[in-house]
Amino acid sequence: TPVAGLTGNRMRAVADPVRANVFYAYDDKALVASSDSGATFTARASLPSGGSRLIRAAPEREGDLWAPLKQGGLARSIDGGASFKPVFDIDYCGAVGFGKAAPGKTYPTVFIWGSVKGLRGIYRSLDTGATWQRINDDAHQYGGPGDGHFIVGDMNRFGVVYMSTAGRGIVHGKPVTQ
């Protein structure tokens, strides 16, 4: 059954973690939202075309969305997709995900596969995207997230991250102290 308001294919809807029956999707140039359990979607905000089809909703936060826009960088909405602001210093973002918050922090760790100031890699932010720390090295690039389009942190263990790859399965990383 076709879904009203969705024009693309291979889109992946994500649920709002707080509001029941609310879903979001990236429809190549727009963030679309549904408030009727995905029966219909309407455009909320314009976004650059060519981004990853897998947006993320921040855990336990209403309307807090992150959109990896590939060459368009990374954008964040805190109003359910009505508007987006760019996350600074991100030149490219192929995937975004969340993990357990750092000790003493309340916002989940944000992980990306992308480029920060021109340097490609796996990054994490402990401060809602204000600063980024590269957590891989040049010898461990894995071809990026490949067709899986995902990077996700462990919500139970701080610092642990998993990423799909381009032909190498799923890789996982953890802090050297674990």
Predicted regions mapped to residue ranges:
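Blade-level signature of beta-propeller repeat domains, shared across WD40, Kelch, NHL, RCC1
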Residues: 143-178
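A short beta-strand motif characteristic of beta-propeller blades
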Residues: 1-4, 41-45, 84-88, 135-140
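Loop/turn-rich, solvent-exposed surfaces of beta-rich toroidal or solenoidal domains
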Residues: 57-64, 68-75, 85-128
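Residue-level marker for isolated small/hydroxyl-bearing positions within beta-strands
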Residues: 25-26, 68, 111-115, 163-164, ...
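Residue-level signature of beta-propeller blades and closely related beta-rich strand-turn architectures
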Residues: 29, 71, 116-117, 167, ...
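Conserved blade-ending motifs and adjacent loop-strand segments that build the rim/top face
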Residues: 48-50, 88-97, 131-156
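Conserved Ser/Thr-centered positions that define the repeating blades of beta-propeller domains
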Residues: 1, 34-35, 41, 77-78, ...
